[in-house]
Structure formats: structure tokens, C-alpha cells
Amino acid sequence: LIEVTGKQFAWAVRYAGIDKTLGKRDFTLVNGDNELGVNWNDAASHDDFMADEIVLPVNTPVSVNIGALDVIHDFYIPEFRMMMDAVPGVPTHLWFRPTITTDSMRLITKNPAFDYVLACNKLCGSGHYNMQKKIRIVSMDEYLKWQSEQKSYYATVVKPAIEAGTFKLPSTENSPLHESTLTNTESSENSGAKIETKLSTGFELVGANKDGVEN
């Protein structure tokens, strides 16, 4: 399970940790040190990690929660013929199955520099072109090795700041804690919008959120 959040002009990528559950977010906690408003009081957030690139295992269903912080963006992977709006305050969701690794696609295209790329397909401002994030589709062994090397944001940034007395966990008793997006594919399947489409472009789209599908 991963969460991809659009902002001017970049993508923030958050992975669920070994518990396979993303920590909750609360818009009242958004500030310069916590742009996603992650609720660090939620133990589920303690093993989540942020990533500079999107790494996915081949032939494995991937659940993606999609959102935005400012204006409307669009989660768009052109090689997959797949896109979904990223709307502030309106969570969207996709799950799909990558079927061709990056290395295999480089051989197929005869382009050793080929990379899958997440782009924004909405004109979101002057820095729109900068909204590109590299995607690597790898074997499961490669993915597990990469995953084991990632460090949780809570353990490396938040906890040391708390221990140093430079950061204090806020009280959230009176604030509306919420899950930033759907947390599993069950909600998607129960919405009646599940579809199955097999393309020859390196992925298999197997589901979308209740608001519809763009592909």
C-alpha cells in the first residue's frame, strides 16, 4: 500500500511499513514540519516511510491512495495508459498489477535509458513540468531488498526530535482524525466499480475507486 500526494510541484510518496497500514492524517496538523499532516500519535504511522522514487514488485497487485495538497493534479503513468485525478480533500484510489519490469521494458524498447515515470496530467501551475517521479518495476527479491533498506520517517526524524525536546506531539483530542484515503482494496471492490483490463503496456489495471476510472 502506498500513498501518492500531489503538490506544487512534486509528488510526495509514502509507503505503509510492515503492518501494511498507513498512519492516519489530520488536516489540523499540517505545518512546515509536517506537510502531510500525519498523526504521529497513531502507532500505524511509526513504520511508514517516504521514498524519493516509486519501486514496485512485478506481477503483484499494488494499492495506491491518491490525493493533493493544493490544486488539482493528475496521477498519470503514460506507459500504463492510466490516470486518476488527485483532488484536495477528495481521496481517490487505484490498484493495478505491473507485468513488465523496467529492465525487460528496456530490452523491449531497445532503449537502455528507459524508465517508467509518474507525471501530472493537469496544468497545475508554472512548475507543472517538474512533477515527474521515477518508477522502478523490479523482481520481488529486488523489491524486498529495497524495502528492507528504507527507514521510517518517525524513527529517523520525529522520534529523535521528540527525545531532543525540539518537537512535541500535539493533542488531537478535539480534532477530526481521519484516514487520508481508502486503506485497502476491499472498499474499492465493494463499490461495484471493479474492472479488469489487460494491456500490453506493462501493467494490468484491476480496480479503481467508486467515482470512476480513467485509463
Regions found by a protein language model. Give the residues of each.
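Non-transmembrane, membrane-proximal soluble domains of secreted or membrane proteins
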Residues: 1-215
